[in-house]
């Protein structure tokens, strides 16, 4: 991307891309994506930087110690002159509003929130699951909770639920116990629990009470997280945007969205919910233009070009 907002190349490279502490950093995958997008722009990725500024909005950049660690790792590759690191939640927020501040909530495999006040103050959360006090932690939690509800319905510890049938059917087995055993013996990758999130929404749409309870629990955690950021930044009496991004928000469950809207508006009546309809990479690119003090016309051009430019060479 040039400073005037022209898109010089775009790529979606599907690979493990979480920089969580304790995992091997996926620098090679990131480097491959940079190499491919640079090639589209006619730039050779070698020992020389390919751009003046690199704005990296990365999953796993959750704590200040993560910011320092990942920045060192990325700087070591000499891809760009100036490395600017943000959590991926900031890309969601920037892609969804041009105010320059507000609240961004991402709910995909996990749940996280970042908020920026009109004075530039920032609130963010560790988003480390139970370790950081999180309760209903995104789509991964919803999938695991669905399996738990199915098991409890079967053995009598909980109410009967259509998940008793729908969960095993999704994995082409007869009983939820078979799913549990496959997870226990590592025959089934635990990441596949994410596949159950849409199943829960489908069951709730069909009137399943237990599925609706789980969805409400997730909505309430989203509300609690967003409202905590709103209160800490003293936004309760202001007008601002709350941007909702991530796979969980790409559903057609009106009750889920309404519950979140009502819960946040009870604390901040001037908050407007905006479901993100642009790729989060738009937010990262706009943050880069913000850092370069680009003109508004450049940012408008970037939005328009990325809206009509497919992410090439998808894998």
Where are these regions (language model features)?
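ATP-binding/phosphotransfer module of carbohydrate and carboxylate kinases, centering on a glycine-rich
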Residues: 1-45, 49-51, 75-76, 95-101, ...
